[in-house]
Amino acid sequence: MNVGSILNDDPPSSGNANGNDDNTKIIKSPTAYHKPSVHERHSITSMLNDTPSDSTPTKKPEPTISPEFRKPSISSLTSPSVAHKPPPLPPSSSSVGSSEHSSARSSPAITKRNSIANIIDAYEEPATKTEKKAELNSPKINQSTPVPKLEEHENDTNKVEKVVDSAPEPKPKKEPQPVFDDQDDDLTKIKKLKQSKKPRRYETPPIWAQRWVPPNRQKEETNVDDGNEAITRLSEKPVFDYTTTRSVDLECSITGMIPPSSITRKIAEWVYANFSNVEEKSKRNVELELKFGKIIDKRSGNRIDLNVVTECIFTDHSSVFFDMQVEEVAWKEITKFLDELEKSFQEGKKGRKFKTLESDNTDSFYQLGRKGEHPKRIRVTKDNLLSPPRLVAIQKERVADLYIHNPGSLFDLRLSMSLEIPVPQGNIESIITKNKPEMVREKKRISYTHPPTITKFDLTRVIGNKTEDKYEVELEAGVMEIFAAIDKIQKGVDNLRLEELIEVFLNNARTLNNRLNKIC
């Protein structure tokens, strides 16, 4: 048996002397070498088993694939052409020892891979950097042909095949993995969100996060509105959230809304009834003030006792009167408390929490009117800090009062609505010279204006000539904000704004009362 017989898989010869001639005939005969068809030469088994020879037997160089290769079907894998091994190529001088690796059947070092499982497993084996470098440097690979790329596809039987693509494709971008999982709860999602990306930082806060500053105070970094009056432009956003509570697992109510306080609702209705009929030209002359004092029973001369323990509205005004004095120790405690708030505010922020104003005035009260007419009460105020002193006169008319009894606090409250009509400057001199004052009192006052709560705190010390000094505490509300809230109710825009303003105004009085309870 000679080399040609081994290559052509011929049976051994009978041993004649012309064996060399037979071998020569086989090599020279054009029909001795059976050329496989195109389909056979490009089948998966032929492509993988007939690997090009290399100097290193353990290397697995990539085969040279025709650009006209098509994906074989399932039927082609089971056809006889797949199992048929094409005859080996005739040996050439350029390849030495190619007969050892020309086929999988004659090569003991390479395992025959003629099943789909073997094909898949063979390409799924991880390759080292040395093997990849050897494959790229293989002499059998055409340098002009692009390196084939393997892609994974799923066939109808849900099995993955390795399909060779001759044209290089761009590397797809890696899609970001989803941050959240369907099984995660809210807390887990928040933690993952914090770990996945950094929060956005703003060099300048967005417009919805900036604090509003009046135009006349934009040059100064302060939170207090300029002006002597407790009037400011406030945001129209609601002050209280009536649909949420601090607890995570509790709801506000069965309806999902927090019902308003009954006392706040009644006081807001009282304010609306007295304010809604005021003419536009007289709105700035309206005063709404809350005075500290005690509701005194006329018969006993003592503070009323209604056998209640919580805040309530007292409506029987005929049997009581309101004493608007506070003790000196209480007056000083309130002054100290407001000064502490101002000091603590300045430690963390620039500007002032309150706008303070000290005054020293002398009030003279006159009653004018003819017989049979309603008397007019005129108050003439002289500013003692100015030289020459300045005189200002107003006609003050009490419209309505509302008594609020606080049995658990030192003081009750009286909510009063009044009209302060200014008297022309030319009439003041005639009033002073032609009439005798009914009462004269000298007072020194410290005013703390806090626009965010539309409140001005007036702490007054009345100096008595023959009696001891008296002390008064009153809170004055910004009426223009109240009128704006009433307009919203009449237009049907916002029905809760008025209640919010009344609640804020009352909360300031309750805060002072709670502070005074500590000194009892």
UniProtKB/Swiss-Prot annotation:
Enzyme class, broadest EC rank: hydrolase
Give the UniProt subcellular location, in the record's own words. Nucleus
For the keyword Transcription regulation, the answer is no
Q: Which cofactor does it need?
A: Mg(2+)
Q: Where is this region: Disordered?
A: 1-185
Q: Which family does it belong to?
A: Belongs to the fungal TPase family.
Q: Which protein are we looking at? A: mRNA-capping enzyme subunit beta
Species of origin: Candida albicans (strain SC5314 / ATCC MYA-2876)
Q: What is the lineage of its organism?
A: Eukaryota, Fungi, Dikarya, Ascomycota, Saccharomycotina
Gene that this sequence comes from: CET1
